[in-house]
């Protein structure tokens, strides 16, 4: 039955939600003994549940990229209590995905401090209910979910490539995506001048659509980064946990939070069930390189990922992202190209 959803273009639907809730993927059992796993956004929801699984499966080191060290410490303590992992297994490194300077500092810190990184799970994401600019001048979800995630991924590539060569098997770079990317229409992103400016325009902001758009752009970014990366060194993929009861709606108002709770009460699986995909994605193998991992299978992404029109838009988008990042870091393309 899963093939009914993995072999056709990804798209949200009640049928897909019901199937995923009723048929959660198997809980991963692969050992991560001796491995170092980096995960952003591990304080709550999917990130917390995935981090807990990595700890239970024996990861020697867990690097937590956290905006709040206080909240990171709370998550660390709770995971230590739940899994009985060693007290020095989890290390907190501050990371504000709304700040290029913080991203650069984080990437340098983990590159310098850890001999190898076996997998990086880029889970941090936001879904603000109203328009808000980041300090870098972009709408917050566009900043965090897309531009900053792409920048962090690129800055981590040298360490991941080096790690893959050192351990004799590919490291992993995982983007956390959403089936909702398949719901995005061409009109939502196509613009005669600039895709980023269109998505950044407050006049176009609708919070549900905006989150889905950022997840489409994130998949486009993943594909371009994967195209510049050998899967013999780093497997780059995108993982969709499915609709989950997670903390992504933490900034919603009372009414919206109530509606969200009712909808997810009917259709959503638990964050624990969804987090299984985040863990299995870093064992998915070379077939998942540049791919969309959902329901524990390499799946067909949305039409704006696979169609000729989507590929043309993706190419334009990526050129714009590199233009933005080049202004922050003149070496960004050299780093990406390895």
UniProtKB/Swiss-Prot annotation:
This is Short-chain dehydrogenase/reductase phmF. Short-chain dehydrogenase/reductase; part of the gene cluster that mediates the biosynthesis of the mycotoxins phomacins, leucine-derived cytochalasans with potent actin polymerization-inhibitory activities and monocot-specific antigerminative activities. The first step in the pathway is catalyzed by the hybrid PKS-NRPS phmA, assisted by the enoyl reductase phmE, that are responsible for fusion of the leucine precursor and the polyketide backbone to produce a 2-pyrrolidone intermediate. Keywords: NADP, Oxidoreductase, Virulence. Pathway: Mycotoxin biosynthesis. It comes from the Eukaryota. It is an enzyme of class 1 (oxidoreductase). Its EC number is 1.1.1.-. NADP(+) binds at residues 46, 71, 96, 123, 211, 215. PANTHER family: PHOSPHATIDYLINOSITOL-GLYCAN BIOSYNTHESIS CLASS F PROTEIN-RELATED, SHORT-CHAIN DEHYDROGENASE_REDUCTASE PHMF. It comes from Phaeosphaeria nodorum (strain SN15 / ATCC MYA-4574 / FGSC 10173). InterPro entries: NAD(P)-bd_dom_sf, SDR_fam. Gene3D superfamilies: NAD(P)-binding Rossmann-like Domain. SUPFAM superfamilies: NAD(P)-binding Rossmann-fold domains (SSF51735). The active site is at 177 (proton donor), 211 (proton acceptor), 215 (lowers pka of active site tyr). Belongs to the short-chain dehydrogenases/reductases (SDR) family. Pfam families: adh_short. The lineage of its organism: Eukaryota, Fungi, Dikarya, Ascomycota, Pezizomycotina.
């Amino acid at each position: 039955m899963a093939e009914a959803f993995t072999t056709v273009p990804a798209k949200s639907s009640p049928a897909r939600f019901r199937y995923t809730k009723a048929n959660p993927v198997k809980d991963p059992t692969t050992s991560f003994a001796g491995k170092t796993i980096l995960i952003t956004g591990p304080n709550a929801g999917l990130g917390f549940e995935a981090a807990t699984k990595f700890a239970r499966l024996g990861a020697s080191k867990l690097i937590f990229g956290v905006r709040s060290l206080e909240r990171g410490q709370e998550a660390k303590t709770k995971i230590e209590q739940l899994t009985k992992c060693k007290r020095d297994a989890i290390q907190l490194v501050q990371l504000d995905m709304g700040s290029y300077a913080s991203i650069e500092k984080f990437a340098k810190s983990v590159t310098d401090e850890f001999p190898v990184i076996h997998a990086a799970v880029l889970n941090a994401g936001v879904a603000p209910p109203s328009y808000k600019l980041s300090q870098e001048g972009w709408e917050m979800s566009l900043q965090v979910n897309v531009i900053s995630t792409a920048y962090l991924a690129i800055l981590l590539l040298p360490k991941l490539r080096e790690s893959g060569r050192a351990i004799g098997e590919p490291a992993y770079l995982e983007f956390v995506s959403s089936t909702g990317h398949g719901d995005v229409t061409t009109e939502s992103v196509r613009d005669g001048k600039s895709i980023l400016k269109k998505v950044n325009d407050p006049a176009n902001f609708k919070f549900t659509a905006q989150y889905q758009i950022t997840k489409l752009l994130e998949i486009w970014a993943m594909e371009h980064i994967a195209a510049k990366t050998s899967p013999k060194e780093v497997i780059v993929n995108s993982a969709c946990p499915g609709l989950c009861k997670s903390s992504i709606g933490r900034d919603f108002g009372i009414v919206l939070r109530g509606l969200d709770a009712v909808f997810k009460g009917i259709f959503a699986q638990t964050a624990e069930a969804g987090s299984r995909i985040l863990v299995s994605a870093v064992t998915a193998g070379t077939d998942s390189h540049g791919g969309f991992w959902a329901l524990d299978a390499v799946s067909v992404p949305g039409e704006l990922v696979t169609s000729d029109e989507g590929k043309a838009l993706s190419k334009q988008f990526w050129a714009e992202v590199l233009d933005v990042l080049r202004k922050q870091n003149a070496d960004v393309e050299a780093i990406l190209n390895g």
